[in-house]
UniProtKB/Swiss-Prot annotation:
InterPro entries: Chaperonin_Cpn60_CS, Cpn60/GroEL, Cpn60/GroEL/TCP-1, GroEL-like_apical_dom_sf, GROEL-like_equatorial_sf, TCP-1-like_intermed_sf. The lineage of its organism: Bacteria, Bacillati, Actinomycetota, Actinomycetes, Pseudonocardiales. One of its GO terms (biological process) is protein refolding. SUPFAM superfamilies: GroEL apical domain-like, GroEL equatorial domain-like, GroEL-intermediate domain like. HAMAP family: CH60 (MF_00600). Keywords: ATP-binding, Chaperone, Cytoplasm, Isomerase, Nucleotide-binding. This is Chaperonin GroEL 2.
């Protein structure tokens, strides 16, 4: 495939045009009075959204050089979304401002490498200033404020606040589509996983088609159980205690299963067999997690335990177990709390060192199952389009709340960036083009507030200069069009979101400024034209 190459100013200007087109499409959504963007989808109806990253992902430009710039800006949005789950529009607007200021300085003869060093130094100083001023976010009301600002909806804020309070910071909050108009919260406490009973004969409540075991014992087995001889000694001892039993194994089959079914039908004693979820190492790890939660010991050859020799001491217990055809929920496992805490700590360490997003996500799920319950927010709306838009806002609100619980919050509305920029007033003691890089960042940090005010119909530059004279924690409330304290009315952003936006924007700006050439595929000529050429060259 032949390539086309653009050099110097021509390449950088094309990249800037691409960044601008993407940022201009996204920035209309910024702030409480921001607008929506309608996306034409290849399948299904159009999508209405005010989520920066959703818009960015849809944008492909016709001009290949400009498209490179748009993809770089898209990178800022997706990277910020991956790290913090929100703040993608802020990051894109910052990147646009830094690229614009930087290219102006390059045109005036600045050295791109020195500019880059200045940008990096300024970014580090701003991030440190934000970290130093961040306030921890604790309690339902604070979380609800963060979620309300993110979703622009108090009812969503309250729902997310309640969900976080009920399942804890590490708890799973899953978001599903509801078939009703209402958006509501469901909590399942304890450990839930997606495997149900092996046979419907285990059902104890035929109306609801579920098996409920109260004050139950739990047998965890790493391999298949097919011989009843292996299981009999243990079953006899359990039958004497009169307590119901949950058997969780790779599989329960053959005569072992038929004997258990006969026992269940005759009501000799209550028993339910369930296949262990997942495969391989994930299944092994999950069984070990359950062992910690329930106080059981996993029966496996590698720990020298055989089913035929196991006594009641290997069993775990729980206050209540509910098994349906698809799910099993274990409530109030009776394992020692210290074991559960140690197990959770171990998973947290694994999350820190993991470099695979998929692994991290699965580890987070395991941690959530251990640490808290599972909250399900069921999203309802009148139309499919509204449902998707609402679901997207709730996802952002949950991500923002988790980010805030992790690292704390800073005043929102673009104000903390203006105040943090005051740290750069002495150019950080740098000189020459490095100092220019610092000043460039100081100017760019005004962009989010400028557009929040502009989208509210105000004069952006006037609002920025007024906020500059205020103290930390004060700024412009675009919802009420007033200046004053932002923390009291709950206009706060997660530190993680704000810091990621600044760092990712600076990273892309440095790349664009140090670009000296851009290489793209040459568009192929029409087939008819191609047919007339090229035949005389083969000798």
């Amino acid at each position: 495939m032949a390539k086309q190459i653009a050099f110097d100013e021509q390449a950088r200007r094309a990249l800037e045009r691409g960044v601008n087109q993407l940022a201009d499409a996204v920035k209309v959504t910024l702030g409480p009075r921001g607008r929506h963007v309608v996306l034409d989808k290849q399948f299904g109806g159009p999508q209405v959204t005010n989520d920066g990253v959703t818009i960015a992902r849809e944008i492909e430009l016709e001009d290949p050089y400009e498209n490179l710039g748009a993809q770089l800006a898209k990178n800022v949005a997706t990277k910020t979304n991956d790290v913090a789950g929100d703040g993608t529009t802020t990051a894109t607007v910052l990147a646009q401002a830094m690229v614009r200021e930087g290219l102006r300085n390059l045109a005036a003869g600045a050295n791109p490498t020195a500019l880059g060093r200045g940008i990096q130094a300024a970014t580090d100083a701003v991030v440190d200033a934000l970290k130093a001023k961040a306030t921890p976010v604790k309690g339902r009301d604070n979380i609800a404020q963060i979620a309300t600002v993110s979703s622009r909806d108090e009812s969503i804020g309250a729902l997310v606040g309640e969900a976080m309070e009920r399942v804890g910071e590490d708890g799973v909050i899953s978001i599903e589509e509801s078939s009703t108009l209402a958006t509501e919260l469901e909590i399942t406490e304890g450990v839930q996983f997606d495997k149900g009973f092996v046979s419907p004969y285990f059902v104890t409540d035929s109306e609801r088609q579920e098996a409920v075991l109260e004050d139950a014992q739990i047998l965890l087995h790493r391999e298949k159980i097919s011989s009843i001889q292996d299981l009999l000694p243990l079953l006899e001892k359990i039958a004497q205690s009169g307590k119901p039993l949950l058997i969780l194994a790779e599989d329960v089959e053959g005569e072992a299963l038929s004997t258990l079914v006969v026992n269940a039908i005759r009501k000799t004693f209550k028993v339910v067999a369930v296949k262990a979820p997942y495969f391989g190492d994930r299944r092994k790890a999950f069984l070990d997690d359950l062992a910690a939660v329930t106080g059981a010991q996993v029966i496996a050859p590698e720990v020298g335990l055989k089913l035929s020799e196991a006594g009641p001491e290997v069993l775990g217990s729980a206050r209540r177990i509910t098994v349906t055809k698809d799910t099993t929920t274990i409530v109030d496992g009776r394992g020692p709390q210290d074991d559960v805490k140690a197990r959770a700590e171990q998973i947290r360490k694994e999350i820190e060192v993991s470099d695979s997003d998929w692994d991290r996500e699965k580890l987070q799920e395991r941690l959530a199952k251990l640490a808290g319950g599972v909250a399900v927010i069921k999203v309802g709306a009148a139309t499919e389009t509204e449902l998707k838009e609402r679901k997207s806002r709730i996802e952002d609100a949950v991500a923002a709340s988790k980010a805030a619980a992790e690292e704390g919050s800073v005043p929102g509305g673009g104000s903390s960036l203006i105040h943090a920029a005051k740290e750069l007033n002495g150019d950080l003691g740098l000189s020459g083009d490095e100092a220019t890089g610092v000043r460039l960042v100081r100017t760019a940090l005004e962009a989010p507030l400028f557009w929040i005010a502009s989208n509210a119909g105000q004069e952006g530059a006037v609002v920025v200069s007024k906020v500059r004279d205020l103290d930390w924690g004060q700024g412009y409330n675009a919802a009420t069009l007033t200046f004053g304290d932002l923390v009291q009315p709950g206009i706060v952003d997660p530190l993680k979101v704000t810091r990621s936006a600044v760092a990712n924007a600076a990273s892309i700006a440095r790349m664009v400024l140090t670009t000296e050439s851009a290489v793209v595929d040459k568009p192929e000529e029409e087939d008819s034209a191609a047919a007339g050429h090229g035949h005389g060259h083969s000798h």
